[in-house]
């Protein structure tokens, strides 16, 4: 059995739950910027990310989508999000964002997604001491549809998006491979 280590309040070896919200460690943001990518380095480790998809090919790799409270956005930003959302479905910009209405309106920044491993999760995002997990099927289907389009573009044009998804993914894959070798020794 794999030994568990505490990273924040998230145990290494503990599995992330698909569709759960988590708070990331600053380390993943530092990796993104060190590889030439751009991310919300100033507050990205304070906001929840949506870990929507377990990678189908790489064990231990997940995909994180940053979220934001839309009420903190100015009118021009909200106009931009609405313009993207109003684009024809064939236009990739229609996949950049998704808005989820709940207790508060959350913006899912799908085009800012990045790969992540449990090592870079600080803790579960909780409300009233309960881990927040997105359960509304319509939102999950739409987020996943848009996410697949973003990743398809990234696969055609590596590092197309500002966070350098391909470079971050390759870095994390090498890290997972190195850790797997250590575990077998």
Task: Give residue spans per PLM region.
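Positively charged N-terminal leader segments that act as targeting/secretion signals
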Residues: 1-14
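C-terminal terminal-subdomain/extension
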Residues: 12-15, 78, 82-185
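Short N-terminal edge-element motif at the start of the domain
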Residues: 13-46
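Sequence-level motif detector for i,i+2 pairs with an aromatic at +2
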Residues: 17-19, 59, 105
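Residues at the C-termini of beta-strands that transition into short coil/loop
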Residues: 25, 68, 117
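Residue-level detector of flexible, active-site-proximal loop/helix-junction positions
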Residues: 28, 71, 120
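Compact nucleic-acid interaction/catalytic patches
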Residues: 42-46, 55-99
